[in-house]
Amino acid sequence: MDPYTVAIIKKLGIEEQVETAATKSPFIEGLANGTAPPGAFKRWLYEDRIYVQGCSLCLAKAINAITHEKGFPKEALDLFLGAYNVITPELAHFEARCKESNVEMPKLKPVPTSWEQALQDNKPEEYYHLSAPDCKSYIQFMTQELFEIPGTSGIDYFMAFYLNEVIYHRAWKFVRESKQFQKNCPEEMEFVKWWGQPSFGKFVENLARSIQDVPFTSATVDIAKKICNFEYRFFSTAFEKA
């Protein structure tokens, strides 16, 4: 991990939780050591597509909150705005790759092209029924419950999204570096190479650097721990049924 991310995780006191969420779930460990059952990866891709739909709304809500918060670092806001703007092209690449690999995808509306539109048109209740229980509960937290926690502010919403990215990148970098995975899973590697690429790691680093001087609260720590737990469980949707 980059030094900025290491510093934040240490400050939050969640070093062990992050590593467990990223590399200790049965799904990620199974991919890395060659014991994941057939079909698990494709099953997880289906759930991941649903989660991205929900996470885009979380990002839109976070942007909306941060834009109204005096003194929040402009660099952090700009990174969030950039993150929202790349969702559509990223999904186009992802869905094209899934089609090439005969991966079933859920029937979803396009992600709204602007975060302002997402606040109006992205309705998680329209796709809850498509998702596995742990995916649904994660989306509910990221799009609704997170923003209802008393006393929270922009740094808490930023942290929720940021840690999601940290764990995601750490997990797939871990899988990508596995010799067993490299040998046994050439088709899956095409997805994993995309997620583990250096540019994604740089994005995570930039997010961390942008909030180095923003103070955390006890709510920030609690939310960070919740995200670690949700991420660990979300990887297990590879073994669930919607």
UniProtKB/Swiss-Prot annotation:
GO CC annotation, single: nucleus
GO terms for MF: catalytic activity
Q: Which InterPro entries match?
A: Haem_Oase-like_multi-hlx, Thiamine_Salvage_TenA
Query: Taxonomically, which superkingdom?
Result: Eukaryota
Q: Which UniProt keywords apply?
A: Cytoplasm, Nucleus
Disulfide bond residue pairs: none
List where the protein spans the membrane.
none
Tell me the compartments it is located in.
Cytoplasm; Nucleus
* Protein name, as recorded: Uncharacterized protein C530.07c
According to its UniProt entry, this protein's organism is Schizosaccharomyces pombe (strain 972 / ATCC 24843)
